[in-house]
Amino acid sequence: MSKENIFVTKPTLPPLNDLIPYLEKIWETRVLTNGGEFHQKFEAALCDYFGVHHICLFTNATIALVTALQALRITGEVITTPYSFVATSHALLWNGIKPVFVDIDPHSLNLDPARIESAITPHTTAIMPVHCYGHPCDVNGIQRIADNYNLKIIYDAAHAFGVQDAGGSILRYGDLSVLSFHATKVFNTFEGGAIICPDEKTKVRIDQLKNFGHVGETTVVAPGINGKMSEFNAALGLLQLQHIDSALACRQKIDEAYRLKLAGIPGISCIQGSGECVANYAYFPILVHEDYFLTRDTLYNLMKEKGIHPRRYFYPLISQFPMYRGLSSAHPDNLPVALDISQKILCLPIYPDLEMSVVDVICQLIANPC
């Protein structure tokens, strides 16, 4: 094992020389943003890759979440998970919406449909679940509840690039799904995001909202924002699509190696999938139970001392941050599963060029930490 630090992820990039022709085209046309040629081609390529009909590109997924809520005119209260990156709930606050936290399923770590109905009030207008670690939510269970109460569903699918169930991409569920192309994701455009739309009318509204609310040169129909993806990011995305399948295949091998080598270690369990037919292996989360040799945080610090940098995704819970902890739904008694998982979770390094020898060292350290 080399002396360099091993982080939880490393951005996947194409060969630099392959990017040069794209840059030359941008320099030639001087079209840098506002829906240029690469933007249009990237949208079309993603629609083809996912098997969907409409997609809107964004500068990042947080702005996409904010805009998705605005596009569907969501107000009042939205039921969501406390077990996610904080941007999920921040998008609600940016829209003046009250998050209502519901506990997670102990196996999938996604929003637990059995707990949603009791959290619905006359002010509830939507549900915002997260496909945590790229493992699909109980989409049918959530949809039944939404249909019964006339609620919208916006999926935070930041982790779910390329994930499929038996019917195809999981991005087809809900009213909208939001993707992240951040540098830490399995597919990146440096920064970026997207909204998968159900129809042309919704796409047009979202495209207007991400362009300040403009319709033409002289008409503004809504207080929109600048959420447009640049031509550079779109060009990079087009190139990245050529390499994504091989990158996911590499991730799968690392995932399989971890599962094999960690099997049988007392107090360590690996998170399983939740029904996906095609996974993306975006994360490798383990749970450090009470019968392990060390506490989770002691193991975490020991690994960092050895130059290995796992992450505690997601600790602390969103509901424990100052802007949320005053909500009645944020009380720990309301979220026992999420709280328990957050104190046991540890995400191990995984990225396409992670050497198997490093995986061996990580697993040996977990097996024999003392």
Could you describe each region identified by the protein language model?
Residues 37-45, 49-53, 114, 118, ...:
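PLP-dependent aminotransferase class I/II
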Residues 179-180, 193-199, 238:
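Short beta-strand-to-turn element immediately C-terminal to the catalytic PLP-Schiff-base lysine
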Residues 84, 107-108, 134, 185, ...:
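Glycine-/small-residue-rich active-site loops that bind phosphorylated ligands and cofactors
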Residues 70-157, 164:
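PLP-dependent aminotransferase-like
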Residues 56, 79, 100, 153-154, ...:
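Structural detector of well-ordered beta-strand residues that form the stable sheet scaffold
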Residues 31, 35-77, 83, 91-94, ...:
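Phosphate-binding glycine-rich loop
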Residues 155-189, 204, 216-221:
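Conserved active-site segment immediately N-terminal to the catalytic lysine
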Residues 1-32:
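N-terminal "arm"/small-domain region of PLP-dependent enzymes with the aminotransferase-like
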